[in-house]
Regions:
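Glycine-rich "substrate-gating" loop/helix at the edge of Rossmann-like oxidoreductase active sites
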Residues: 86-89, 116-123, 143-153
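Mid/C-terminal beta-alpha module of Rossmann-like enzyme folds, strongest
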Residues: 159, 166-212, 246-251
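Non-catalytic, hydrophobic alpha-helical segments
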Residues: 20, 153-160, 174, 185, ...
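Conserved beta-loop-beta element that borders a ligand/cofactor-binding pocket
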Residues: 67-68, 100-121
Length: 251
């Protein structure tokens, strides 16, 4: 196994590799300015297109390419397995273009890793949100009724390995099997770290402060289902938010 950090500009040497896992993508957890949107696209769509061209001239047999559950858009209470259509909005279009940027020979087994919010002791998402809750100002976002696709870091990694080692192809939802609404998630975090969560961030305030990131990232509802992994026999170690929180806080 070889780890390579690549900005997508110069050519990449894939000699000797039979499989590639591409996890590139600039973090989207802040206000989406035009400058940042350009970075989002460059680090996802453009880099993936360049990688695809390199794979064409290589002996790579498997490509696992990052994507995100944002591809489904804001869908209310609709269940969203991998066969669900893409949604609308900037984030959904970005994710669709990201996946479409993969143009490799038909004999290259390709998997699109549609990942939700990754939770783990060292994950970026947990690092940012845990501070807010520990300060005693954590709370639900907007109405709190929006479904929040999430996954424990352990299952994120093991799920990727599972896709690599099994004949899985196409989109794969890397999310926990138990969906949670934002209000339920907030309650579980507060209970785990022994903090009350009386506050609620109003939707209008979040939109004013964070713009489209609030609208499409924090307040959008996506009840994503990991149907492909479940059908293939993957067993989640952390299927519930309560079990995930217990492990994270314990460590």
């Amino acid at each position: 196994m070889v780890w390579r950090k690549w900005d997508g500009k110069e050519e990449i040497d894939l000699e000797g590799l039979s499989a590639v896992i591409n996890l590139s993508g600039e973090a989207i957890d802040q206000r989406w300015t035009n400058k940042r949107k350009a970075l989002f696209r460059k680090s996802r769509v453009d880099l993936t297109a360049n990688l695809s061209r390199a794979i064409i001239n290589s002996n790579v047999e498997v490509l696992l390419n990052a994507s995100a559950t944002g591809i489904y858009g804001d869908r209310g209470d609709e269940g969203l397995p991998e066969i669900a259509s893409a949604g609308r909005g900037y984030l959904a279009e970005l994710c669709r273009d990201w996946e479409d940027a993969v143009e490799v020979p038909e004999n290259v087994r390709t998997v699109f890793l549609r990942t939700g919010v990754v939770l783990g002791k060292d994950s970026r998402a947990w690092e940012k949100m845990s501070k807010i809750f520990k300060w005693g100002i954590g709370g639900k976002l907007g109405s709190g009724r929006q479904w929040m696709p999430w996954i424990h870091l352990y299952d994120e990694v093991e799920g990727i390995v599972f896709c690599l080692e099994n004949e899985i192809e196409g989109p794969v939802n890397l999310v926990a099997p138990e969906s949670v609404r934002n209000a339920q998630f907030t309650k579980a975090v507060g209970k785990a770290i022994k903090r009350v969560t009386p506050f609620a961030a109003p939707a209008f305030g979040l939109k004013l402060l964070l713009g489209d990131f609030a609208k499409e990232g924090l307040l959008a509802s996506a009840r994503v289902v990991p149907q492909v992994l479940l059908d293939a026999g993957y067993e989640f170690k952390y299927p519930t938010i309560e079990k995930a929180m217990s492990e994270i806080v314990a460590n």
